[in-house]
């Protein structure tokens, strides 16, 4: 009986994997024209001009597409009077550089190397038909990287480093998509009582009631739920992180030095206002140490290398956004704008280092994006940078 059940389950998994491969192959076929950007992104201008108005279904999320347009910024300015006043200047119609997205006159977004970007069209939803859809532009870089530019929010998100990666991820790295798409599934996996408790905490957080959230976390400390994460394709999800309710005193006893680091980031009079440590996010990851060997063989069966548990505190602020604080490294960054967004993003919210902010539009709690242009030397980690205003 169990063997038959295993065979049936294995057959379902293999069918699901085959469907994922076919979906990825179809997505790659739809976006093969993005390969024209290698070396000269301006080649995409002619393709987008010839196929203007054509809708191309995005790999993820469902009901989202790309409307090809050779000059999307001009149409955005004509359709919305105030649209061009948000975000980057109107001269962005020509291929620009990542250097133009500097946070000030001396500091670039990620490094001092520029990257030519070519706009190819609007990113929009089939469900909503709004003029604000013309304020979300897809851009392609010289090295094949794909970006989405939110003109209204003045933010540039690096979706993928190559066309192949974009056909697999889609808009998974864009945090704004999780907030705007109401049909995205909840990534929580827990019991009914735990789910109801987290919903009550989320409702209290939306009302900016830190006292209620703190009381619930103290009464129900230790209650947890798993957060699912997609692996390989956007439709296969596995438990990858755990969200556990806690109280600050317990975490301060475990990490005495982390309390001082957290108060240095969230100082008195911070724009985000009062704050509260309400939970802990934990997930396993492979270590970066070269020894012991990363992969060993036991009985001719390869086993994964050493793994460690990554722990981040969930900090709720009075202004609304959730912050993640790593007590071992002292790093802090914006996790999500609300609990509902965190439930949709899952563990992916812990790796939010792909968004660049325009000058003067850097939000408190935004992490510096990871640089994709300058690779660190082997055995060396990137230099730490400031994380909060």
UniProtKB/Swiss-Prot annotation:
Note: The first DR6 exon is not required for propagation in cell culture. Loss of a part of the DR region may occur in viruses propagated on cell cultures.
Task of the protein: Inhibits the host G2/M cell-cycle progression in a p53-independent manner.
Localization per record: Host nucleus
High-level lineage: Viruses, Duplodnaviria, Heunggongvirae, Peploviricota, Herviviricetes
Protein keywords: Host G2/M cell cycle arrest by virus, Host nucleus, Host-virus interaction, Modulation of host cell cycle by virus
InterPro entries linked to this entry: US22-like (IPR003360)
One Pfam family in the UniProt entry: US22
Gene label: DR6L
Originating organism: Human herpesvirus 6A (strain Uganda-1102)
The protein, known as: G2/M cell-cycle inhibitor DR6
Biological-process GO terms, alphabetical: symbiont-mediated arrest of host cell cycle during G2/M transition
Cysteine disulfide links: none
One CC-aspect GO term: host cell nucleus
Record note on domains: The N-terminus is involved in nuclear targeting.
Family recorded in the similarity comment: Belongs to the Roseolovirus DR6 family.
């Amino acid at each position: 009986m169990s063997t038959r059940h295993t065979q049936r389950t294995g057959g379902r998994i293999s069918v699901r994997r085959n469907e994922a491969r076919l979906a990825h192959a179809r997505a790659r076929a739809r976006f093969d024209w993005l390969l024209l950007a290698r070396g000269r992104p301006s080649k995409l201008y002619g393709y987008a001009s010839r196929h203007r108005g054509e809708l191309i279904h995005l790999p993820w999320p469902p009901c989202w597409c790309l409307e090809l347009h050779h000059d999307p910024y001009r149409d955005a300015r004509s359709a919305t009077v105030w649209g061009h006043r948000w975000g980057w200047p109107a001269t962005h119609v020509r291929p620009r550089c990542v250097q133009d997205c500097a946070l000030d006159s001396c500091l670039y977004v990620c490094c001092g190397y520029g990257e030519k970007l070519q706009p190819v069209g609007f990113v929009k939803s089939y469900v909503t038909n709004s003029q604000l859809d013309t304020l979300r532009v897809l851009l392609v870089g010289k090295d094949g990287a794909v970006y989405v530019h939110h003109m209204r929010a003045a933010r540039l998100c690096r979706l993928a480093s190559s066309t192949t990666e974009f056909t697999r991820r889609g808009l998974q790295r864009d945090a704004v998509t999780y907030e705007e798409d109401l049909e995205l599934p909840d990534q929580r996996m827990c019991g009914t009582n735990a789910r109801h408790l987290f919903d009550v905490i989320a409702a209290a957080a939306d009302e900016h009631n830190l006292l209620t959230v703190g009381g619930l976390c103290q009464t129900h400390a230790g209650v947890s739920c798993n957060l699912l994460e997609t692996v390989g394709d956007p439709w296969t999800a596995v438990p990858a992180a755990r969200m556990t309710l806690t109280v600050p005193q317990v975490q301060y006893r475990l990490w005495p030095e982390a309390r001082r680091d957290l108060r240095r980031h969230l100082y008195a009079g911070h724009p985000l206002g009062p704050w509260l440590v309400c939970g802990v996010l934990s997930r396993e990851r492979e270590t970066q140490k070269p020894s012991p060997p990363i992969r060993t063989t036991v009985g001719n069966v390869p086993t994964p290398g050493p793994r460690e548990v990554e722990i981040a505190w969930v900090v709720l602020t009075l202004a609304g956004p959730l912050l993640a604080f790593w007590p071992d490294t002292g790093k802090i960054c914006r996790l999500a704008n609300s609990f509902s967004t965190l439930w949709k993003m899952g563990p992916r919210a812990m790796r939010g280092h792909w968004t660049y902010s325009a000058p003067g539009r850097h939000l408190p709690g935004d992490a510096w994006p990871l640089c994709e242009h300058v690779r660190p030397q082997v055995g060396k980690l990137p230099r730490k940078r400031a994380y909060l205003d």
